């Protein structure tokens, strides 16, 4: 049986297998980083470079470049779909900008593009595509849950405040719903790579790094609200699929 055939027959095993690759890389680099005293940003770069390479290899083996949205460009008619996530992605700049040195800003931009490519390759490219044979709505929800779960790893080593880590995972679940919906509506993964990079870039220049200290109750609540908004927006984009999936009460 080919790898593509296996993923089609076993969507859940395949999706969890892809997730295990992500978790294994994150934990392995974390252990190596502690031993060799890697900085947090270096660890992020190493993790996502490894995931990007592995993701490209898997896409090539599966022959999923088209199915995962890499061969479809961005249509002008789809641009309005991106307005809400882009606007939310810019919210971090309301806290101020701590990083202004041109070389640092450029390095952050390069790093976040790498992160966007690597994470979208796994979660909206490999995992979402693997789950689609089991049903569109189920694939969107489960892939979003699997996207949110690894965010909990940010609490390891004290990189993120525990309370913020929890609410950020809620926001990540909502963002996953919206991203999956956009991926299915547009047929392209490229807008998500850019928007994902925007979220991470604005956070980096606002915080000055990847460490997140304790946040105010207002910020924590806002993160939960953002997650809920993204869930609703994503489901709105998928309303036709929701109607199709709902049995007719008269039948």
Model-predicted regions and their roles:
Residues 39, 197-251:
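C-terminal membrane module of polytopic membrane proteins
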Residues 21-38, 86-96, 148-152, 200:
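Membrane-embedded alpha-helical segments in integral membrane proteins
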Residues 165-221:
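Functionally important transmembrane alpha-helices
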Residues 1-11, 66-67:
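Short, Lys/Arg-rich, polar N-terminal cytosolic tail immediately upstream
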Residues 36-39, 92-103, 158-162, 210-217:
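Membrane-interface helix caps and helix-loop-helix hairpins in membrane proteins
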Residues 118-144, 158, 184-188:
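Membrane-interface helix/loop boundary segments of multi-pass membrane proteins
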Residues 72-81, 107, 132-142, 191, ...:
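Cytoplasmic-side transmembrane-helix entry/capping segments in multi-pass membrane proteins
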Residues 11-60, 75-83, 102, 106-107, ...:
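Alpha-helical transmembrane segments in multi-pass membrane proteins
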């Amino acid at each position: 049986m080919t790898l593509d055939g296996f993923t089609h027959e076993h969507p859940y095993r395949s999706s969890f297998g892809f997730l295990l690759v992500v978790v294994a890389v994150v934990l392995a680099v974390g252990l190596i980083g502690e031993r060799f005293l890697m900085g947090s940003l270096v660890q992020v770069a190493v993790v996502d470079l490894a995931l990007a390479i592995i993701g490209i290899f898997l896409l090539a083996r599966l022959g999923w470049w088209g199915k995962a949205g890499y061969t479809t460009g961005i249509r002008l008619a789809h641009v309005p779909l991106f307005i809400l996530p882009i606007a939310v992605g810019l919210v971090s700049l309301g806290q101020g900008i701590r990083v202004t040195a041109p070389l640092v800003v450029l390095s952050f931009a390069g790093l976040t593009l790498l992160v966007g490519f690597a994470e979208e390759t796994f979660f909206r490219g490999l995992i979402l595509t693997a789950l689609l044979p089991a049903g569109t709505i189920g694939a969107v929800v489960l892939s979003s849950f699997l996207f949110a779960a690894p965010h909990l790893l940010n609490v390891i080593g004290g990189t993120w405040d525990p309370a913020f880590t929890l609410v950020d995972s809620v926001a990540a679940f909502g963002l996953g719903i919206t991203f999956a919906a956009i991926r299915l509506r547009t047929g392209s993964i490229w807008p998500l790579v850019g928007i994902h990079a925007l979220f991470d870039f604005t956070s980096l220049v606002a915080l000055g790094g990847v460490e997140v200290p304790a946040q105010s109750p207002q910020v924590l609540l806002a993160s939960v609200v953002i997650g809920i908004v993204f869930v609703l927006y994503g489901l709105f984009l998928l309303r036709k699929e929701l109607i199709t999936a709902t049995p007719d009460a008269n039948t």
